[in-house]
């Protein structure tokens, strides 16, 4: 059987002076917008803090929220969300000011776990509180006696807080999953 054999011809090319400065092969996407330590990540944290603070302010401005446990739970979850978002926003601001990368495995894992827990708790609080205005308005027809619009606004801001937290969680989780590679 006649098989062809490849012939290798060496090329005379000068070696790079500093091979350490060569970029690694492949495309590196470590600074996705929305990741910790990026301007997009800081923007998401500010949105989360803003929505949680509005929900907290609107719900606590009503006099009747303390009589319903779901509303108290929403207040608790928004306080937790405010504390978490403010803390991570401060870390993001620091990282941006000193040009520090927050893409190490431990930090991203911590942010991912924190985002996952706060998302789950915030979403459950918003879902629990969402049923009460529906009950008051549709079933009991008592919105004239209760501030239903305030309740609905607080619940809507709670959901907006959850939806602005979801990209942070998913990006951090993706970063952890893709680094196992």
From Swiss-Prot:
PANTHER family: CASP-LIKE PROTEIN 5A1, CASP-LIKE PROTEIN 5B3. It is a multi-pass membrane protein. Belongs to the Casparian strip membrane proteins (CASP) family. One of its GO terms (cellular component) is membrane. It comes from Zea mays. Keywords: Cell membrane, Membrane, Transmembrane, Transmembrane helix. It is found in: Cell membrane. This is CASP-like protein 5A1.
